[in-house]
Amino acid sequence: MTTEDTLTIAGRSYQSRLLVGTGKYQDFAQTRAALDASGTQIVTVAIRRTNIGQNPDEPSLLDFVPPSQFTLLPNTAGCYSADDAVRTLRLARELLDGHDLVKLEVLGDPQNLFPNMPETLKATRTLVDEGFKVMVYCTDDPIQCRMLEDLGAVAVMPLASLIGSGMGILNPWNLRLIIDQSSVPVLVDAGVGTASDAAIAMELGCDGVLMNTAIAGARDPILMASAMRKAVEGGREAYLAGRVPRKLYSAAPSSPTEGLIAAVK
């Protein structure tokens, strides 16, 4: 893979196509070790759950994951309305000195964490109007993804399966439809369980993959982070290389017979 093959979001290019969350680790030191092993450049942070300066008497994630070394992606995990999500990202912009690249998620159900798309669309419209560059967690509905792009989202992030489920890529066909129609990056968000899931997403043509539980919840998070790095890179290279068509039978022998020396009688 050449250095020219980069992920570009909102005008900024990244060498890594793996985005990693910062929740569920043992401590901030393990978080940093996993991020380093993953090779990620974009790190997502749940503003409602992680201290990035709003609690000055507590350890801050920014001491371990400084904005000078990573692109921070504030997210609205835990928000169930457009209003809550917008307020949360306004706070993030204030805490991060005007940072405007954000990840929007508006949840609809606390049990399955499925996105509430009407509220998501409403929040996207407001945030774009306020100058945010919005990456949006959404369903794998191509129509909804097109609506988000039309509203000004800089990336759409359809779920592969439920958040934290580890179920992998359940509907590759919808993902392909979204990829084929989109002029903004398409990143799988939620549901990745192991390295092969990440590779499949990339082989389908996704521009990137975001994950948290698959790494933080592994028996060895640092080793899994390394595995995910290789899977994303390998899946991307396979997509660029182009797989052979699937066929029930080979159309011709894999070893051609033309030009072979005839057996001596």
From Swiss-Prot:
A Pfam family hit: ThiG
Keyword Cytoplasm among record annotations: yes
Keywords: Cytoplasm, Schiff base, Thiamine biosynthesis, Transferase
Catalytic activity: [ThiS sulfur-carrier protein]-C-terminal-Gly-aminoethanethioate + 2-iminoacetate + 1-deoxy-D-xylulose 5-phosphate = [ThiS sulfur-carrier protein]-C-terminal Gly-Gly + 2-[(2R,5Z)-2-carboxy-4-methylthiazol-5(2H)-ylidene]ethyl phosphate + 2 H2O + H(+)
Enzyme Commission no: 2.8.1.10
Sites where the protein binds 1-deoxy-D-xylulose 5-phosphate: G164, A190, G191, N212, T213
Pathway in which the depicted protein is active: Cofactor biosynthesis; thiamine diphosphate biosynthesis
Organism domain of life: Bacteria
InterPro entries tied to this protein: Aldolase_TIM, Thiazole_synthase_ThiG, ThiG
Principal location: cytoplasm
A Gene Ontology term for the protein's cellular component: cytoplasm
Molecular function GO terms recorded: thiazole synthase activity
Subcellular location: Cytoplasm
Quaternary organization: Homotetramer. Forms heterodimers with either ThiH or ThiS.
Family statement drawn from the similarity comment of this UniProt entry: Belongs to the ThiG family.
HAMAP family, sorted: ThiG (MF_00443)
Role, per record: Catalyzes the rearrangement of 1-deoxy-D-xylulose 5-phosphate (DXP) to produce the thiazole phosphate moiety of thiamine. Sulfur is provided by the thiocarboxylate moiety of the carrier protein ThiS. In vitro, sulfur can be provided by H(2)S.
Protein name per the record: Thiazole synthase
Organism phylogeny: Bacteria, Pseudomonadati, Pseudomonadota, Betaproteobacteria, Burkholderiales
